[in-house]
Amino acid sequence: MLPCYLKGRMMLKPRYRILCFFVALSVLLPFSTVRADQPFQRLLPFLIDLAGWQGEKPDGMSMQMSDTNMTTATRDYERGEAKAHASIIIGPAAAGALAPIQSGMNMQTSEGRMVTSTVRGMNVLKAYNSKDKSGTLVVALDKNAMFSLAYEGVAEEEALALADKFDWKAMQAATQTK
């Protein structure tokens, strides 16, 4: 039999442990949800399934530094020997890649071409290598945001039709959301 002065302490220990557990849980839980909401996650739904193509799981990366941020979301697709790579990029890398669009660059060679134009009201750069049946379509979403579809083993017209299936305007709105 326990003395009466110890009975109160014995009851206090389990209650104290339970209280400590819930306090620790309430402190740590917000950090786990912050980690789950990475900026790239808002872009993943725009990397849609393409009919007739096998798409890998979309993935992304967000990097924050003291003076700059960069966010990317990517998805790879395959159909037999043909391949496509869709990406949405926000940050300095996108700003640099958009320079040819902003300058209105146009170039033609015997092996391919690089042409800037307007598609669906948005500035785009279409690069195509006819020998390899490969190329890239870059869509300017903002001054530091872009969507690109790189492809290989696909005719240019089909690649443009594939790129047209993505919702560029919705991407543009999402890249401007901070």
Where are these regions (language model features)?
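Bacterial N-terminal signal peptides that target proteins for export
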Residues: 4, 10-22
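Low-complexity intrinsically disordered segments
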Residues: 7-8, 30
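Bacterial N-terminal signal peptides
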Residues: 20-30
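Serine/proline-rich low-complexity intrinsically disordered segments, especially terminal tails, linkers
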Residues: 28, 53, 166-167
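Sec/Tat signal peptide C-region and signal peptidase I cleavage site
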Residues: 31-36
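Short, solvent-exposed recognition patches
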Residues: 38-130
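A short, solvent-exposed beta-edge/loop patch
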Residues: 78-79, 83, 107-178
